[in-house]
């Protein structure tokens, strides 16, 4: 029998906690036998004194096991359970293509996603733009769609990882969100509760990233790779660029449209293609579907070119309550804003840098994102045709199209976009889409 205050004292004194102590404390978070003050105190002690890898693994697995852990064995699936998680960005629409692409290659992708907050867009918000699509189906329907389509992208259900829900809300109120140990456990407990065989982790770097510096992003990527593999799930982290909007757009309905254009081959943004392929190829290799990156990319290009990935996306949409002809006719179903107009730069030259976070906040200003949890969204608004770094900017070439509902919102977004996209005299050096891979063998 342990005492919560003794566990807090130990961590306050920078000592390592045992697996049993961590399990006891997490059980207390879940069943309310540990108070809010005690949770806040442990969070602060961890923030200042950190946790070693064994502690991080124990915290992650204890939180994972605080609720239901999905088990797919009874479905007799003939492929690996694989998934991807992103730390979030602007125009990060990867999940919408990656899930169907991985499923088309023989994987099963039960993707449990989140909503957007602050400048980052949420995958679930994009699906909420599709009429009828259920982001919170019951367990039976979720399993049915995973089995039949190979992929289902839904929201976190109440019985998954209850410890994280309580711990995170307290961390949020007590300034202990930015601990690498606690971020690692929060992300991975939710992902690993989906019963995964393998995970590709997308850790963003740059002006639109969650972590403030490249070094912090790399530290998080290393922590996630070490802890996930230590918890028994094959995992690789990719450090990817978020110094500009990833897709050509940012918003909800507009990103769904870009995902369909990507899957059907109508238009594939080259940067979006590179990051999607990098993550998806890693999933196939970790899951044993491909033995080399070249082989994985060949498989992925094949399912894009033969239409199988697009077909699976359509099957998932209709399976979860959306229209049966959504891929063929997205324009019939996706909402459109009243005002769609270009914004021009006030000078000519080249797009040299972007404050990607500010572009994400411009979407929030338009009504397409949340300032606080629970805010209602306008799914039609956002930015499209956003210029890329290195693009030549002239007086008659828009730097973006703004989709707004009112003139006031348009004017505010126009100011924000102009301020966020910096124009200079010379073309900047091209930055890589993927900075590096961190695999278990690299640790």
Swiss-Prot record:
Gene: deoA
GO biological process, one term: pyrimidine nucleobase metabolic process
Gene3D superfamilies xrefs: Nucleoside phosphorylase/phosphoribosyltransferase catalytic domain, Pyrimidine nucleoside phosphorylase-like, C-terminal domain, Transferase, Pyrimidine Nucleoside Phosphorylase, Chain C
Metabolic or biological pathway, per its Swiss-Prot or TrEMBL entry: Pyrimidine metabolism; dTMP biosynthesis via salvage pathway; dTMP from thymine: step 1/2
Subunit composition and interactions: Homodimer.
Sequence similarity: Belongs to the thymidine/pyrimidine-nucleoside phosphorylase family.
Protein's recorded name: Thymidine phosphorylase
A Pfam family: Glycos_transf_3
Keywords, sorted A to Z: Glycosyltransferase, Transferase
EC number(s) reported in the record: 2.4.2.4
């Amino acid at each position: 029998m342990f005492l919560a205050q003794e566990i807090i004292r130990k961590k306050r004194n920078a000592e390592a906690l045992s697996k049993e102590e961590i399990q006891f404390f997490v059980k207390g978070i879940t069943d309310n036998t540990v108070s809010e003050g005690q949770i806040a105190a442990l969070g602060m002690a961890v923030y200042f004194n950190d946790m070693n890898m064994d502690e991080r693994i124990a915290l992650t697995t204890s939180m994972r096991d605080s609720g239901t852990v999905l088990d797919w064995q009874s479905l007799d699936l003939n492929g690996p359970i694989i998934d991807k998680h992103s730390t979030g960005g602007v125009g990060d629409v990867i999940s919408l293509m990656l899930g169907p692409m991985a499923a088309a290659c023989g994987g099963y992708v039960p993707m449990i996603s989140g909503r957007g907050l602050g400048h980052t867009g949420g995958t679930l918000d994009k699906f909420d733009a599709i009429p009828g699509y259920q982001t919170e189906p019951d367990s039976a329907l979720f399993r049915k769609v995973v089995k039949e389509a190979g992929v289902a992208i839904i929201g976190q259900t109440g019985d998954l990882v209850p410890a994280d829900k309580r711990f995170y809300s307290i961390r949020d109120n007590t300034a202990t969100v930015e601990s690498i140990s606690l971020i690692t456990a929060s992300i991975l407990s939710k992902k690993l509760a989906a019963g995964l065989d393998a995970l590709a982790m997308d850790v963003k770097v740059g002006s639109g990233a969650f972590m403030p510096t490249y070094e912090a992003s790399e530290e998080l990527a290393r922590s996630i790779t070490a802890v996930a593999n230590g918890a028994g799930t094959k995992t690789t982290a990719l450090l990817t660029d978020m110094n500009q909007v990833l897709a050509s757009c940012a918003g909800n309905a507009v990103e769904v449209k870009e995902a369909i254009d990507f899957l059907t081959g109508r238009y594939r943004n080259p940067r979006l293609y590179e990051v999607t392929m990098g993550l998806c190829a890693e999933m196939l290799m970790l899951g044993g579907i491909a033995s080399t990156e070249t082989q994985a990319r060949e498989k992925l290009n094949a399912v894009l070119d033969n239409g199988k990935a697009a077909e699976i996306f359509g099957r998932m949409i209709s399976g979860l309550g959306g229209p049966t002809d959504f891929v063929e006719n997205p324009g019939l179903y996706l909402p459109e804003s009243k005002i769609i107009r270009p914004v021009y730069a006030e000078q000519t030259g080249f797009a040299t840098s972007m404050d990607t976070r500010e572009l994400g906040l411009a979407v929030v200003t338009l009504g397409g994102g949340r300032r606080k949890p629970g805010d209602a969204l306008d799914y039609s608004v956002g930015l499209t045709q956003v210029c890329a770094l290195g693009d030549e900017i002239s007086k008659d070439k828009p730097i973006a199209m703004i989709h707004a509902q009112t003139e006031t919102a348009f004017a505010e977004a126009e100011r924000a976009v102009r301020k966020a996209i910096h124009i200079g005299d010379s073309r900047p050096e091209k930055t890589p889409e993927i900075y590096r891979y961190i695999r278990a063998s690299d640790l």
